[in-house]
Amino acid sequence: MSLPDFTMRSLLDAGAHFGHQSHRWNPKMEPFIFGTRNNIHIIDLAQTVPLLHQALKAVSDTVARGGRVLFVGTKRQAQDAIADAAHRSAQYYINSRWLGGMLTNWKTISASIQRLRKVEETLQGGGSGLTKKERLMMSRERDKLEKALGGIKEMGGIPDLIFVIDTNKEQLAIKEAERLHIPVAAILDTNCNPDGITFPIPGNDDAGRAIALYCDLIARAALDGIARGQGAGGVDFGEADQPPAEDLPAADLPAETPEPTTAVTEAYEAPAEAFELLTAPRGAPDDLGKLPGIGPQIVKKLNDAGLYHFWQIAAMTPEDAAKTDHDLKLGGRIERDGWVNVARSLVAA
């Protein structure tokens, strides 16, 4: 894989160049403003393109070193895109509300995460010994904790880089990251303050299409980092169960027929390797912790059950996934967190 490609045209089509009304601006953003049209500031995308590329490279390098990226976007327009991008790239996210101390008071946050796990285990076990009211109260507690901490419950520590949509709304997250010297990549609209942002990306932080584009690019950069990390770790793609997928430039694709795309889709839907459990790993086991929502305890549970490699999970049919989830009492994690799709991306990387 390689860093995701994008063009100024793709940014224009997404509306990334539209800023806020000219009277709602932060003077510190003046260097990134191209001009004004109908009292709306226009962002200079000629600067956005290289700055966005720098941010993508930083994300890829961070993940390639084994680092963790935290996606942060709690505004309504960003919530779904943030969660989807984090799931697809096996990273972490906050899309509900930033709780004070999420980074600077990780010890307390970890205690809340442990409580969430304990509640989940109790409810997955049927809640025996609890009254109906106690089960209801526990379910509500689980839902509340899951909403606040579900995106980071498997993070295992503070992230190595955070990606932020809307620095005005996420000021607390940025201040905590700055205090801990965590690099920040952030989308900066014309009403934002670029101070303290390690990798500034001038762009519209309100339009849904623009937010979706940013998140997709960051997610793909993280997947590139995962692939590079596997290569640096000695993964021999020549001996892989499935060959890595290569992205062909548009000019190299057939002009009319979509057959190659269809073939790739079918390959994903019906992988060559059939799903099977192993008595021992074939060579070095994969780092299953790269799958979303997986921590050391779940990795051990999967290994004990005979799951060591991404290709095994990628080969799962819906029936295989449901049976494995039931047998290991995973509480619907395989389907909910998209393990199969992420595993297929990692196998193809």
UniProtKB/Swiss-Prot annotation:
Molecular function as annotated in GO: structural constituent of ribosome
The entry's keywords: Ribonucleoprotein, Ribosomal protein
Alphabetized Pfam families for the sequence: Ribosomal_S2 (PF00318)
CDD domains given in the database record: RPS2
Any one GO biological process: translation
Gene3D superfamilies for the chain: 5' to 3' exonuclease, C-terminal subdomain, Glucose-6-phosphate isomerase like protein, domain 1, Helix hairpin bin
Domain of life where this protein originates: Bacteria
SUPFAM superfamilies: Ribosomal protein S2
Entry-linked InterPro entries: Ribosomal_uS2, Ribosomal_uS2_bac/mit/plastid, Ribosomal_uS2_CS, Ribosomal_uS2_flav_dom_sf
UniProt GO cellular component terms: cytosolic small ribosomal subunit
Family classification: Belongs to the universal ribosomal protein uS2 family.
Protein name: Small ribosomal subunit protein uS2
Organism: Methylocella silvestris (strain DSM 15510 / CIP 108128 / LMG 27833 / NCIMB 13906 / BL2)
Gene that this polypeptide is encoded by: rpsB
